[in-house]
């Protein structure tokens, strides 16, 4: 899956899954726009990794929750690279995956739901609104949105987080239906628990062990495991796929 001369925008790319995705695209020859919010040093390290892997990259600080900031980021990418071929919406509101400390439904305020909606759907909305005029003009483009296997099997009911990710699936499929005739594809990748990441740092070892025992492939995903399916959905290998959700959880979703 070569991405030579392709330009890829990855949001939330300074660490974890986003960083792994950025590195993977660069290793296939892509130019990667490494979006981040606060950690400039981490973003710079990802840029260096991308260049060492054989691609090109630069970091752009932008809050995907701000339509103005996102528009400026997309305009900068187009000014510097002349094009955008792929968008990966990976950024989301900070969340702690701790089954023993999660809030029950009666303890979850609507504001908690709204915060996750704003992060998951709002961020993707802003990025898509900013990049779609360019995609329409070129009559091509691929959008990959990162969701969660919890939308299919909420083994732990993280009410606000999972509901927002489910909404992102609906958002993606509606876009896929509307944009397909224009040559623009929209798909989702749904990882299970990914370790190590900042979000999974709160997940206790005993729960991780129980998850491993329930997973047919008998381990937990690493950030690099998520990158491959993202590249597949962004590539010509998946040119006849849109509106799909690929589950990347070692088969756990079957149980």
Regions found by a protein language model. Give the residues of each.
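Catalytic Tyr-X3-Lys loop
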Residues: 85, 106-125, 140, 144, ...
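Conserved glycine-rich cofactor-binding loop
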Residues: 7, 14-15
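Short, small/polar-rich loop/turn modules that mediate ligand/substrate recognition or access, typified
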Residues: 180, 185, 241-243, 249
């Amino acid at each position: 899956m070569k991405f030579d001369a392709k330009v890829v925008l990855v949001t939330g790319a300074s660490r974890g899954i986003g960083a792994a995705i950025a590195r993977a695209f660069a290793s296939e020859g892509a130019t990667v726009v490494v979006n981040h919010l606060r950690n400039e040093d981490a973003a710079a390290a990802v840029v260096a990794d991308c260049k060492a892997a054989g691609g090109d990259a630069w970091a752009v600080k932008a809050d995907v929750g701000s339509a103005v900031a996102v528009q400026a980021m997309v305009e900068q990418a187009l000014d510097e690279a002349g094009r955008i071929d792929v968008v990966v919406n990976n950024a989301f509101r900070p969340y702690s995956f701790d089954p023993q400390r999660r809030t029950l439904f009666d303890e979850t305020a609507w504001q908690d739901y709204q915060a996750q909606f704003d992060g998951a759907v709002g961020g993707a909305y802003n990025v898509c609104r900013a990049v779609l005029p360019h995609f329409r003009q070129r009559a091509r483009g691929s959008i990959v949105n990162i969701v969660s296997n919890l939308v299919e099997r909420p083994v732990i009911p993280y009410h606000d987080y999972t509901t927002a990710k489910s909404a992102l699936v609906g958002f993606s499929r509606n876009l896929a239906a509307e944009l397909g005739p224009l040559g623009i594809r929209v798909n989702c990748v749904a990882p299970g628990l990914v370790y190590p990441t900042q979000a999974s740092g709160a997940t206790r070892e005993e729960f991780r062990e129980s998850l491993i025992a329930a997973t047919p492939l008998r381990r937990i995903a690493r950030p690099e495991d998520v990158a491959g399916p993202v590249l597949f959905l962004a590539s010509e290998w998946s040119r006849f796929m849109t509106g799909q959700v690929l589950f990347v959880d070692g088969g756990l979703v079957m149980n």
